[in-house]
C-alpha cells in the first residue's frame, strides 16, 4: 500500500463521520484519488500536503474520463472532507462551478428497475441476506436500512418506521404497509431476527454487509439498488393508475392538467417513502 493510500485510510478510521455506507464510499473514493494522484506524478505526496494544484490536476483528469456530474460531486465532496481534516477547509471552493461542473440532472434515460426473481433468491444461502433483499424489494429500502432493520422497533400497525441511524443523511421516515404479502414478509423477519437486526449474533454490521455483497454477486443480482427503482415504479402506478414514464407510461409533457396534479402528488409521496427531500430526484426512478 502506497503512503498516501495508507494515510488516507488512517484519516478515515480516525474520523468516522456519517453512516457506515457513507464512510465506506468515502474511503473507496479517497483510495481511488490517491491512486490517481500517484499516476499523475505525485508519488511522494502526504495527506497533509494537499494543494490546489492537486485538485486542478484531478479535475482535469476526470474531465478527460467524461464522468457524470454526480460522480464529480461525490469525488469533490470526498476531497473537501480530506481538506477539512488536514486543516485546509477553505482551500477548495464550495461552489462546484469553480471547476466548470454544473448541476446534477435527475432525468433518467432508461429504467434501472430490477425485479427480485425467485431463482436469484434461491441462490442466496444466508437467510438474513435473503430477507434483507426481500425488504428492499417490498418497501424500497436501501441496503444499510434492510440489514439494520430491527422488527421490534420498525414494525407498526400500518407502517414500518426507519430509525435515523439506519438511513442515508440521518432522515428517519416511515413506509406504509399496504399488502398481505408485505405483512407475511414482516412476520418472516420477526421469526428470524427475534427483535434484533437482520444480522446474525456472530457478526457485526460490516461483516454482514460484506457477506451481503458476496451473496448478491453470486446470485447474479448486478444492481440491488434497482429494487428501489422497481418499488418506486409500482407505487407510481398504484397512486396514479398509469405506468411511470421509465416503465413505458406516458411522458409528463403529454399529461392533462388533472393528470399532472396527480403525477406531482404521487412523486411527493414516493420521494418521502424513499427518503428523499426533493421530488426532482424521482425522475431518476420514474
What are these regions (language model features)?
Residues 220-264, 276:
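Short basic/aromatic active-site micro-motif
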Residues 159-165, 248-286:
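Short functional hotspots where side chains directly engage DNA or cofactors
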Residues 100-119, 168-181:
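DNA breakage-rejoining catalytic core of tyrosine-based enzymes
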Residues 136-159, 283-284:
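Short, charged phosphate-coordinating catalytic segments
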Residues 114-143, 261-267:
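Basic, Lys/Arg- and aromatic-enriched nucleic-acid-binding interface segment
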Residues 9-104:
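N-terminal core-binding DNA-recognition domain of tyrosine recombinases/integrases
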Residues 178-241:
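Active-site/catalytic core of tyrosine-dependent DNA strand-transfer enzymes
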